[in-house]
Amino acid sequence: MRWDIDSMMQITQQMPGEARFGVAVRPKPVQKESNIGFYLVMLAMLFEFGRPQDVVPPLKALPIPTLLDVSLFVAVLVSGKATFSNTQTKLWMALLTFMALWVPFARNNFWALMTLKEMTLYFFFYLGIVTFVNTTSRMQKIIFMWLGVHAFLGVNGILHHGQGVGGWLGDENDFGMEMNVAVPVAFFMYQAATTQRAKLLYIILLGLIVMSVVSTSSRGAFLGLLAIGSYCWFYSPRKIMSLIVGICLAGLVLIAAPQEYWDRISSITDDSTMESGTAGQRMFTWGIGWEMFLANPVFGIGQANFPWTIGEYLGGRTWQTKSLSGRQAHSLYFTLMPELGLVGIIIFGTMIYLNYRDTRVRQFFPIGQHRMGQKRENEERKDPELERAALFGNAILGGMIGYLTTSAFISTLYYPTFWILMGLAVALRNTTQSYAVAQSDIAVSSNPEQKVSLWGRPRSVRLRH
């Protein structure tokens, strides 16, 4: 079933001679929407995350991801549905403007410009999702597509000992972060499945994704996986079944993971790791990053300029006789703070809050379906489409939790993960809103004699695009 209002039945006005409460219902002819924009979104998803150009090198002869993103932007403008009124969209445009202003003043103008270009292309991708993923069926298809791509990534990662296909997914820590994002999506899709075959498929996919995280031997990915597991159980409507699934997955990891993996994980708290290992080096780098932020608290030093500026703040200090000039911050947060300052922190933090709000789609359900204290009655009245949307919201929010926790230890601010998840969150809110409003209109028109109490009256919902 589609969720866009235009595809629902239209209620005509009462005709002369009809009963007082008679209602004539006839379908309104709807011009079929072109699928070109949506197909471009699917292709962009494949090339951005699946990266076939890294598997088949001849594909690199053309900048296919760039061409797809630009084509998406053109398709959005041509569609006549382009709108920039959404709050996340406005914030993103403000961020791009801020980055553009930094280009001529940043220490390394080239990387500031290249990062601005990448973020602009992600913005085009985001607009394509918000514009063309406008029905329930399309939302479901894009999530299936996204999971299918990550299934391929998982198999490839396991076969290559935790290494990604290439590009921004080449490093095992970055690959572990991306697969952590996929864990809650597969988990809640399993809960949304209505057939045993589909449930089995998602359970297998979930096990595959978890084992791909294990294959990276990434300690940061392991900590992120623990946070995601807690999130999935907490937000699951079936706590006991989810606990059983979690125990089975833990058993799989215990059986399949080699001893070398556990030796590496156990080194997280070793004194050697904290004092002279990678953890100590990260904390030393973060300390320098904090000094950079304090010296440039409002506007920062410019996007992608941490490696080119850290040398100024070292003041002759070294890490075990080695200079860290040119080193990345190895943290989402210690990239954001010194590079974009309070301006970037406020924009990014507001985006996180709005994404959280948009994934809580039960706020758009008809009054009564999400009320507490009416469980038995609600079980009969639940709309499966809305319940599935709620699970999709949990999946997208869980993906963001996976990104935000695992990225505490790697520099992922300018990767597409967060920005595309934001597009999915906005699209989910819009489709759920449209469907809920349309269902409320149909419910009222189908029983015009029914008295609606003050507390049961459908709320007016203002659609935001």
Annotate each language-model stretch with its function.
Residues 46-58, 335-340, 383-429:
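Membrane helix-loop boundary segments at the extracytoplasmic
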Residues 2-4, 12, 211-215, 235-276, ...:
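A membrane-periplasm/extracellular boundary helix in multi-pass inner-membrane enzymes
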